[in-house]
Amino acid sequence: MSGGLSVLGLKDDDVRRFLTAKTHIGTAQLDFQMQQYCFKRRSDGVYLIDLKKTWEKLLLAARAIVAIENPAEVCAISSRPYGQRAVLKFASFTGATPIAGRFTPGTFTNQIQAAFREPRLLVVCDPREDHQPVTEASYVNIPVIAFCNTDACLRYVDVAIPCNNKAQHSIGLMWWMLTREVLRMRGSIIREIPWDTMVDLFFYRDPEEAEKEEQTQVVPERSIKEAPEFPPDQWGVGDTAAVQPEVADWSTAAEIPFQSAPAPAPAPAPATDDWASTGTATVGPTTEWGAATDNSWAS
């Protein structure tokens, strides 16, 4: 398919990316419809995928996506966690409609529900995991593009892109390459200039690891203004002396009127007379506690 034009040929950089992400490594099972896309079988029983056919099918899928006038009518689906971030990035760059996560049954067939949609093209991450949207697409005649491994069933799949769809780096790389080819065919980016978007943006990231990376980020310390240095003979001068508050004269401060407390009453003088003595008093008739009077009742 791409053999006629050298511009559309598979470049060495793309082959290096395929090999690094292990896109060519399949599974130990082989479906009879995927046999045409396999290159050979290793000694351990794992089938290897022909990367040239992978590239040709990738270009065919990009042409089918570009042929849709309204980009929102292209639906990208991934129920696997490894492909959800790549699907969202693909939709943000191409304008497609993403469905990341669980697919609601009846989205393409049940017109009563609020999530009903009528896309013109469907792109799925794995026909095994996303069997529900693929089956519903066959009911309403929606063409399906799928990333297929060696054990995938091609029933109801119109364009199969052979690749390793079980590795997180491989599936992220395939979505990145599909996005790049769509933008190139639309004329959004130039084919001769490398795309400035890194492929790492399409890779899956564990939420726990992302939180740990955010927590381990070093917070930049605030710059502290250094105080000016003075020689020993000038200690005490400078900003420190200027900041000292002015001391007021407490003797000249205004007196606050206040009410003085009343003086305490003088204590009574102690008694000087002897209680036991029977002497004569100087002030009046002497009376003792035990003395009898003239009209004494005891006489």
UniProtKB/Swiss-Prot annotation:
Region feature (Disordered): 210-299
Highest taxon, organism lineage: Eukaryota
CDD domains: RPS2 (cd01425)
One GO-annotated biological process of the protein: ribosomal small subunit assembly
A single GO cellular-component term on record: cytosolic small ribosomal subunit
GO MF annotation: an example: structural constituent of ribosome
Family annotation (PROSITE patterns): RIBOSOMAL_S2_2 (PS00963)
Biased composition (Polar residues): 275-285
Main localization category: cytoplasm
Places the protein is found: Cytoplasm
Keywords on record: Cytoplasm, Ribonucleoprotein, Ribosomal protein
SUPFAM superfamilies: Ribosomal protein S2
Pfam family membership, one: 40S_SA_C
HAMAP family in the cross-refs: Ribosomal_S2_euk
Subunit field text: Component of the small ribosomal subunit. Mature ribosomes consist of a small (40S) and a large (60S) subunit. The 40S subunit contains about 33 different proteins and 1 molecule of RNA (18S). The 60S subunit contains about 49 different proteins and 3 molecules of RNA (28S, 5.8S and 5S). Interacts with ribosomal protein S21.
Family: Belongs to the universal ribosomal protein uS2 family.
Free-text function comment from the UniProt entry: Required for the assembly and/or stability of the 40S ribosomal subunit. Required for the processing of the 20S rRNA-precursor to mature 18S rRNA in a late step of the maturation of 40S ribosomal subunits.
Protein name: Small ribosomal subunit protein uS2
